[in-house]
């Protein structure tokens, strides 16, 4: 049976993610105490219900991170496929969302300010984030978050999932990257008026960057680095690794390099591609 645990920071979109799981055909339970998870799984099996499970867990249920990791290991040992989805957002974004909704943080009744509550929650949940697939919703609306969840669900993962993500530095760096590479020193098609309207997915940009020795050297170096270290991370039982490729605007060089790396890594690892700033390009 496939079981998805959804966790993350309050205000980051866990409820939206859970609703998308329900729309995708999962049997969903919100705010389940972790000690009840084995009983829920057993009940589901006894009913011969083949519907996949999605369970939201957070600080309201008094989540014990050590217990959570033990539960995951135990369920996997029984042959269940257990995935963890973690949603988060930047602190300033969470503060704004709480202000707009006028809702209190779940920890706010413990004599802490909102900022202190957010910091405590982030520290508390960090060990769970380490084994999860992370979605940063800072610059997402509900529809975009739903799309990100759907794209993640499409990946039939049997081993390490490698997320190749392009981003523009001027929009902020992704906070969930395991490796980050800066492409701003490479030749930039943006300064060619004929290439500026295109993205790194288009043939004119590919032809231009294919002919740049420095660009090809960079792709080779990143491929060597990634393929050297990924097996070691896999040995540590990591489920997800995010490789972030950044440049100034996020439209040309890095999109090309992410796509180039994906072609080279395809067949060796499960891949998920994200282009954060190239809005016309779908994650896949």
From Swiss-Prot:
Task: Provide the binding site for ATP.
Answer: 8-15
State whether keyword DNA damage applies.
no
Give GO MF terms, alphabetically: ATP binding; GTP binding
Q: Where does the source fall among the domains of life?
A: Bacteria
Q: Which residues bind GTP?
A: 58-61
Give the UniProt keywords, A-Z: ATP-binding, GTP-binding, Nucleotide-binding
Decide whether keyword Cell division is in the record: no
A Pfam family of the record is RapZ-like_N
> Which NCBIfam families does the entry link to?
PRK05416.1 (NF003828)
Task: Please report which protein family the annotation says this sequence is part of.
Answer: Belongs to the RapZ-like family.
**Described function:** Displays ATPase and GTPase activities.
Return the protein name.
Nucleotide-binding protein NMA0948
From which lineage does this chain's organism come? Bacteria, Pseudomonadati, Pseudomonadota, Betaproteobacteria, Neisseriales
